[in-house]
Amino acid sequence: MKIKTKQFRVGEGEKVDLGKWPTKVDPFYESKEHYHELLRTQVERLSDLQQLLYASNRHAVLLIFQAMDAAGKDGVIRHVLSGINPQGCQVFSFKHPSATELQHDFLWRTTRDLPERGRIGVFNRSYYEEVLIVRVHPDILQSEAVPNGENFGKSFWHKRYRSIRNLEQHLHANGTRIVKFFLHLSKDEQRKRFLARIDEPEKNWKFSAADLEERQYWDDYMDAYEKCLSETSSEDSPWYAVPADDKENARLIVSQVIAETMESLKMSYPETTPARRKELLQMRQQLLK
C-alpha cells in the first residue's frame, strides 16, 4: 500500500487554512474486499511493531485523536488497533472533567494517563479540548478556577499553546513519540452521518441534541482547529489532518502513519548475553531428560 502520508502532515510553523485541506481523497483501495485485506496487513504490521516496542522498552507512543462529532474517531481506534495486544495498548476517552480535575491545571487529568515505556497510549480527545471547545465556549473557563485577573484574550491562548508545546517537548526528550490526528470531516458529511444516526434505530443512541447544538458553531470550531494545528504541530510531535469523509480511507492513512512512526524508532529485541545463553542451554537439556 503506497500512501504518501507527508501530504497530510502539518508542517511546524505552517499557517493552516482548513478550507484548503481535503476532507476526501481518491481511495487507496479498489473494493471493500481489498480494503479489508489492506487493513488486515496493516494491523498485523502494527501488532509486530507493538511487540517490539514492548520488548525494547525504550520508547512509548502516544496517539491523539481530535475531530468534530461523527468524524469516526471511535471507528478508527477500534479498527486500526484491534490486533494489538491489550496489555500493550491503553485507550482513554476524556469527556467532561470531574470536580477534582477542575481543581488542577488543565494538563493534569491527561498527564496521569500517559503511556509508560513499551506501551501505546491512545487519547480519544485530549488536553487539546482546552484550546478547542473551551475556546469556542470560553464561559467554560469560569468552572476551571483560573486565577483572578486572567484576561482570556489572545495572550491567554498563546500561553496554553506554549504549555502544550513544552509538555510535548519534554515527553519527546524522555522517549515518548507523539502523533496527533485531526480527522477532517466536511460539514455536509457530518449532516449525512447525523441523519443516519436518526434514521437507523441501531444508531439512535449515538445522537443527542447537544450534537446538533454544537454543529451551529462549526465555523468557530474550524477557526479554533486552524489556530491549534498552526501553533502546536512540530517536527517531533506532528499533526496530521486526515481526510475523514471516507472512513475506510481514513483508517488506512492513520494505520500507515502509526506504522511509519514506530518503524522510525531505534528498536530491537534485547540481546542474549553468553551467560544467559548458557543458562538457556542448561534448562533446555533438563527439559529433554
From Swiss-Prot:
Gene Ontology MF terms in the entry: polyphosphate kinase activity
Which Gene Ontology terms describe the biological processes this protein takes part in? ATP biosynthetic process; polyphosphate metabolic process
UniProt-listed InterPro entries: P-loop_NTPase, Polyphosphate_phosphotransfera, PPK2, PPK2-rel_1, PPK2-related
Q: Name the domain of life.
A: Bacteria
The UniProt record lists the EC number as 2.7.4.-
Which keywords, in A-to-Z order, does the entry hold?
Answer: ATP synthesis, Kinase, Transferase
Recorded catalytic reaction(s): these are: [phosphate](n) + ATP = [phosphate](n+1) + ADP
Alphabetical list of Gene3D superfamilies matching this protein = P-loop containing nucleotide triphosphate hydrolases (3.40.50.300)
Q: Show the SUPFAM superfamilies listed in the entry.
A: P-loop containing nucleoside triphosphate hydrolases
Record field: transmembrane: none
Q: Quote the Pfam families the UniProt record gives.
A: PPK2 (PF03976)
Family membership:
Belongs to the polyphosphate kinase 2 (PPK2) family. Class I subfamily.
Q: What is the annotated role of this protein in its UniProt record?
A: Uses inorganic polyphosphate (polyP) as a donor to convert ADP to ATP.
PANTHER family to which the protein is assigned, alphabetical: POLYPHOSPHATE:AMP PHOSPHOTRANSFERASE, POLYPHOSPHATE:AMP PHOSPHOTRANSFERASE-RELATED
The protein, known as: ADP-polyphosphate phosphotransferase
Native organism is: Rhodopseudomonas palustris (strain ATCC BAA-98 / CGA009)
Organism phylogeny: Bacteria, Pseudomonadati, Pseudomonadota, Alphaproteobacteria, Hyphomicrobiales
